Design a protein with these regions (language model features):
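Extended amphipathic alpha-helical interaction segments
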Residues: 139-276
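Non-transmembrane, amphipathic alpha-helical segments
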Residues: 29-32, 36-43, 89-100, 116-123, ...
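Hydrophilic extracytoplasmic domains
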Residues: 270-322
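C-terminal motif of bacterial Sec signal peptides marking the signal peptidase cleavage site
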Residues: 22-26
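N-terminal Sec/ER secretory leader and immediately downstream segment
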Residues: 32-146
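Bacterial N-terminal signal peptides that target proteins for export
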Residues: 2-15
Length: 322
């Protein structure tokens, strides 16, 4: 064999391999792996949407019940001029903090989807930057400069002739690098939606307790012939019509509180299962990218949980409109 022939063969080998990697999925992501990533990404975006919607719903529930408590006397409340702190514990700043966690989850799903399917380096880098920026805004998530830079560098290197193989490597690195902060995000969401914790949902249940206990005690003084101010013998006395109206309003408020808390409890149960599904699917994703033989059971289960959560939310919303 001549030197020239050996030289040509040596140069042709990597070229042939490069063409093979570009033309086939074996060196990069298989169709099955891309489908798994797409399903995980879309499901995670849906989870984030449900987190956002139900955080807002809980705040609205509390404001509505507290407004009802104020309305027991007057029948209506001027929300523009009231001095009552109707959203205490669930104010806009608190809500915004929690919505950032949901936003980071959504950005993560978008980044994975872009990384798995988009060949434009600019789009890849933009998706990475948005995710990292979103993640670093979440209180309780410690993303070091080194880890943030590592994620960015992995994404920025995706491109060129070996795009498929590099994309696969990048996905593996990104999943490893984001494991801890993503699990922390999941913990934050689960903590807020756990009715036994003194967090977001606890404000709603505490409001119901206030209606059932302290307000109930006050209602005992609302009776025909009793003074409207128990501490002032000169205050007017309750009339039968006034007592009936106030009692009706109170009973309606108790029923409303029970319905809103029950809704929150049902959502809480499904939400916690969905977050657990996210944890398991996120862990499995790294293994799936490494091997095409691994089953997609956890990702499929994660999708099923989110689908169930969405359907429950729609059913409960339809009941409220009736």
């Amino acid at each position: 064999m001549s030197m020239t022939f050996r030289r040509i063969s040596f140069l042709a080998a990597p070229l042939a391999l490069s063409l093979l990697c570009l033309g086939l999925t074996g060196c990069g992501l298989t169709v099955r792996q891309q489908a798994a990533i797409s399903k995980f990404s879309a499901t995670t975006a849906a989870l984030a949407g449900q987190v956002e919607d139900n955080l807002v719903q809980t705040r609205n529930d509390v404001v509505a019940l507290r407004t009802g408590m104020l309305a027991l006397d007057a029948g209506t409340v001027d929300l523009e001029n009231t001095s009552a702190d109707l959203d205490a514990g669930l104010n806009v700043d608190e809500l915004e903090t929690r919505l950032k966690a949901a936003g980071a989850l959504k950005r993560f799903g978008m980044m994975l989807e872009t990384l798995a399917t988009d060949t434009q380096s600019g789009e890849l880098q933009a998706a990475s930057d948005q995710f990292v920026a979103s993640l670093r805004q979440v209180q309780g998530v410690n993303l070091s400069e080194a880890k943030a830079e590592a994620i960015g560098q992995v994404i920025s290197k995706v491109g060129g002739l070996w795009i498929n193989a590099r994309r696969k490597k990048a996905l593996q690195r990104v999943i490893v690098e984001t494991r801890q902060p993503l699990q922390t995000l999941a913990n934050l969401v689960a903590h807020d939606f756990n009715v036994t914790n003194e967090q977001w949902l606890a404000v709603l249940t505490a409001t119901q307790d206030e209606i059932n206990d302290s307000l109930q005690s006050q209602m005992e003084f609302v009776a025909e012939g009793k003074h409207t101010n128990p501490e002032d013998d000169k205050s007017p006395k309750w009339k039968e019509s006034e007592v009936t109206l106030r009692q009706d309003r109170y009973q309606a408020l108790k029923l409303e509180a029970a319905a809103r808390v029950k809704r929150a409890e049902l959502i809480s149960e499904r939400m916690l299962r969905s977050v657990a599904g996210f944890r398991g699917a996120h862990e499995d994703l790294f293994v799936i990218i490494q091997s095409n033989k691994v089953t997609l059971d956890k990702i499929d289960g994660y999708y099923t949980e989110i689908d169930s959560l969405i359907r429950l939310s729609k059913i409960l919303a339809a009941k409220e409109r009736k």
